[in-house]
């Protein structure tokens, strides 16, 4: 594992010169997102917009539905259970290729909060309960992603280890526990992995919400030498002056936020030093240089090869290689806890009929939800997997529904409905304005529909 190297003096001098060319308003504009997933560009200094994408078990991209599929990695908990840093670094390189395929510059992962209880609502996207294991596997993940010229994001800094009241909870923790447990994985990701981005969490620690916390400066920036960007979790920035005076660098999502004109006024009135704004802009330009978003500067690593086109899955041999790597990772992270009477593996020549019982056997449940969720191109349910393995051997596989465990109604699948305009399997989705005029019409192949933040369908006005 080779951590990313720091910027050289020539690049630093150029960044200083670019910052000096911007007036206060343009500098402050750069420090809040342009949308839910993009930064502002600034042609005057050769800066293009950068795209951030959810992770960490895949790269979602800006389109979050069945039209933009993604490689679906095993749960990060399974990745840590492999205890295999080289394998995880390879998976990081795959994520970099996926990010570039979807035109993303920053991957919002890995999550290195600790699994304090099995009831934690997002622990499936964390690596483990052990700070050493989380740090080493997380650093390998970061190194792999950034080897492909894509920024990895260490999140959620720090002590965001419970979903309950995460927006308001104030975690009280002594110095030794904080450093030896909760900060330890982040330190490894910064020092060993060379992470380019760190995400400040929603929660507070010892009286300060994390977007205003002194922990962003020390130990993160000063003691550990972090020279990248500290981005807020989405809508986690609750103040203008306090957050700007802290070591927070970038507010998401945009374009609205507590900085903007309020921060310009705070600087002009002397409540926030302009040097603090300059440091934030300098870090953002440094990140842009690393991912290839700053004109005239070679990225820190070349973009990996990827198929042409936005969001399309790898084809042919590339798809086979990706599937093989994901399958190997899933197997490496699995543990057979007990094998009574050497029942497994089943001897196929002694089988005639196999019963598979339960509704979940027919469902390919490969991931959790929320920020970690992606739309895989292809999944295999336990039932389909057993049939594929056993039926060619002459074994009959019988499925029984068993007890119904789902409350409510399942969404219709594409095979159950047809588009009234084209007759294809699927549905016709129309977006109407307040007067019933069609703003947009599109064919969809899923009954599960959703939109995030300002991802309003084309032509629809934002409801702000």
Can you say where each PLM-predicted feature lies in the sequence?
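Glycoside hydrolase catalytic-domain context in secreted enzymes
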Residues: 1-464
């Amino acid at each position: 594992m080779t951590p990313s190297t720091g910027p050289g003096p020539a690049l630093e001098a150029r960044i200083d010169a670019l910052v000096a060319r911007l007036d206060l308003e343009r500098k402050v504009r750069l420090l809040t997102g342009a949308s839910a997933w993009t930064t502002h560009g600034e042609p005057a200094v050769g800066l293009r917009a950068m795209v951030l994408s959810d992770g960490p078990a895949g790269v979602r991209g800006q389109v979050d539905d069945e039209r933009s599929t993604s490689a679906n990695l095993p749960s990060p908990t399974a990745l840590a259970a492999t205890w295999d840093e080289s394998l995880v670094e390879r998976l990081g390189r795959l994520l970099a290729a996926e990010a570039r395929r979807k035109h993303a510059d920053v991957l919002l992962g890995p999550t290195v909060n600790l699994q304090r209880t099995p009831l934690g609502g997002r622990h499936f996207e964390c690596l483990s309960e052990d700070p050493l294991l989380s740090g080493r596997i997380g650093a390998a993940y970061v190194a792999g992603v950034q080897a492909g010229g894509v920024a990895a994001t260490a999140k959620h800094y720090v002590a965001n280890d419970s979903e309950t009241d995460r927006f308001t909870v104030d975690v009280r923790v002594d110095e030794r526990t904080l450093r030896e447990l909760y900060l330890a994985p982040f330190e490894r990701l910064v020092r060993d992995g060379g992470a380019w981005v760190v995400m400040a969490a929603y929660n507070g620690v010892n009286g300060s919400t994390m977007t205003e916390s002194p922990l962003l400066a020390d130990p993160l920036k000063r003691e550990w030498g972090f020279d990248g960007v500290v981005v807020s979790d989405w809508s986690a920035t609750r103040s203008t002056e306090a957050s700007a005076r802290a070591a927070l660098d970038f507010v998401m999502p945009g374009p609205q936020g507590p900085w903007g004109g309020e921060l310009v006024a705070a600087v002009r009135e002397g409540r926030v030093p302009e040097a603090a704004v300059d440091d934030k802009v300098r870090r953002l330009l440094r990140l842009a240089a690393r991912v290839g978003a700053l004109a005239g500067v070679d990225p820190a690593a070349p973009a990996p090869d990827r198929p042409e086109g936005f969001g399309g899955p790898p084809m042919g041999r590339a798809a086979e290689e990706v599937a093989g790597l994901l399958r190997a990772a899933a197997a490496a992270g699995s543990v057979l806890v007990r094998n009574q009477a050497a029942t497994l593996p089943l001897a196929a020549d002694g089988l005639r009929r196999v019963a598979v019982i339960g509704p979940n056997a027919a469902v390919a449940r490969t991931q959790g939800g929320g920020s970690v969720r992606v739309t895989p191109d292809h999944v295999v349910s336990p039932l389909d997997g057993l049939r594929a393995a056993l039926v060619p051997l002459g074994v009959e596989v019988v499925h029984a529904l068993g007890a119904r465990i789902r409350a409510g109604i399942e969404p219709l699948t594409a095979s159950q409905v047809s588009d009234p305009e084209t007759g294809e399997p699927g549905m016709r989705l129309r977006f109407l304005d307040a007067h019933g005029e069609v703003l947009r019409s599109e064919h969809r192949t899923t009954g599960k529909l959703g939109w995030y933040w300002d991802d309003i369908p084309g032509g629809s006005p934002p409801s702000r």
